[in-house]
Amino acid sequence: MIRRQKYGDEIAKAQVLIEALPYIKKFSGTTVVIKYGGSAMLDCNLKRMVMQDIVLMKFVGLNPIVVHGGGPEINKMLERLGIESKFVNGLRVTDEATMEIVEMVLTGRINKEIVSLINELGGQAIGVSGKDGRLLKAEKDTSNGDIGYVGKIVDVNIDVITMMLEKGYIPVIAPTSFGDDGKTYNVNADTAAGKIAEALKAEKLILLTDVEGILSNINDKSSLISRMDLEHAKEFMNSGRINGGMIPKLECCIKAVENGVKRAHIIDGRLTHSLLLEIFTDEGIGTMIGKECFDDDNL
């Protein structure tokens, strides 16, 4: 008993590893697309922990792909330049001046910071934008009216991604995309991650957010819905109980699962090691969406 008390912390750590074993076995060799954004991009400690999670996922046999946003950083730069940020249904209104800032921040700064941190932590990452290798082809999105250089993805060149994965690299993708009209388009990072996951028929699509997941009551943090099948997710989408940036998140999760992604997750990126907790533990921490009803496991 004394011995157990003395090594209590070590035993607890061992139990965590034991709990993770079936998930490591289950997901080894599978592809997981992670949309990285929100507060986890601004807090240096959180940023490091997210990248540690991603490197660990790679080391235990998963194939993580990072698609990143940059909303907070873009907002800060626009504010510094005296340009007002405007949104329609969670999508940034993007005129020509804003598009230049978006591309500069996403591809020139954030993408390279993520790549550098992954490499520092022992991983091997390559950073690209949707324009590189014609990775993400887009056209103007008019579903919310004319909101400028906002695009919707019409094609994903998976050869670029699979080439990196086959060589053991972690792809880090900025969602700025090209159009056949020669223009650059700003594509919502959640949507881009969803389209990439669909094209690859990924095991999982995981969206890091600044909320606990999907709440049945937006004003009650304890009302987290931990699991939803497609029918429930669609009903919730049409209920009017979500707004703002959660709209494209839930929408892209629904489309991803409809188009071959096994599970889509919306999780709180503000929590320490949230990715590992969602993937490798029995309970998970956020909302998981699948095609059909779930058994009592997280697989």
Curated annotation (Swiss-Prot):
Keyword annotations: Amino-acid biosynthesis, Arginine biosynthesis, ATP-binding, Cytoplasm, Kinase, Nucleotide-binding, Transferase
Alphabetized Pfam families for the sequence: AA_kinase
Gene Ontology biological-process entries: arginine biosynthetic process via ornithine; L-arginine biosynthetic process
CDD domains: AAK_NAGK-C
Keyword ATP-binding carried by entry: yes
Entry EC number(s): 2.7.2.8
Binding-site residues, substrate: 70-71, 92, 186
Family to which the UniProt record says this protein belongs: Belongs to the acetylglutamate kinase family. ArgB subfamily.
Record-linked HAMAP family: ArgB
Protein name: Acetylglutamate kinase
Organism this protein belongs to: Thermoanaerobacter sp. (strain X514)
